[in-house]
């Protein structure tokens, strides 16, 4: 009788262990499967800087979608957002820093382009302080573009253009976003090599 009880107890214990082990194994598998699934969902966006891969925080808004809610700081240190650009077509010329040759060239080129556009504002956007942006445009005599800084706003995160790795981590990638007077995205370009200039023609054609 005692032996029978002992056997029953041992069987119960073994069964318990087996269930526990099986549950643990299944749980581990489920966690692993979920992690794998999630890693597939989040595909990293990358560009290059001098041929070296660097990560970008997200993806540009889709053509046809509404421009995400954003904020930028102007030369007077006031903030602007979606409501401030409503009613005008806008080209956002986005880049790392006004103090680099390619960024300076793109600002000059878009200044020239802006002179021939109607009902269109061209914003040159970087993480530079507004004073640096204003100083550059003032010394170069660039009066057709507007400058705006992302240094204390959500702009980079909202549009998915923050550089998240590499030597320029923390500033913006090189990109162009064009929107119509109602805030609908007409064209986007994430320049694959930061040292290269954007496709100016594609930006202009999006407004035709």
Residue ranges, per PLM feature:
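Chalcogenol-based redox active-site neighborhoods
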Residues: 2-4, 25-208
């Amino acid at each position: 009788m005692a032996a029978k009880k002992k056997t029953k107890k041992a069987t119960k214990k073994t069964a318990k262990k087996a269930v526990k082990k099986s549950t643990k194994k299944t749980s581990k598998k489920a966690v692993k499967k979920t992690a794998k699934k999630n890693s597939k969902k989040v595909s990293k966006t990358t560009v290059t800087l001098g041929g070296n891969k660097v990560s970008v925080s997200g993806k540009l808004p889709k053509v046809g979608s509404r421009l995400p809610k954003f904020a930028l700081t102007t030369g007077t240190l006031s903030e602007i957002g979606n409501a401030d650009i409503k009613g005008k077509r806008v080209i956002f010329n986005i880049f790392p820093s006004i103090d680099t040759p390619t960024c300076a060239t793109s600002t000059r080129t878009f200044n020239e382009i802006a002179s021939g556009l109607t009902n269109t504002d061209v914003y040159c956007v970087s993480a530079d302080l507004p004073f640096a942006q204003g100083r550059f445009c003032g010394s170069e005599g660039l009066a057709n573009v507007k400058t705006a800084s992302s240094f204390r706003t959500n702009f980079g995160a909202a549009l998915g253009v923050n550089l998240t790795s590499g030597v320029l981590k923390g500033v913006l990638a090189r990109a162009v976003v064009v929107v119509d007077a109602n805030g609908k995205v007409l064209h986007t370009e994430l320049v694959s090599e930061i040292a290269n200039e954007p496709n100016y023609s594609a930006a202009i054609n999006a407004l035709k």
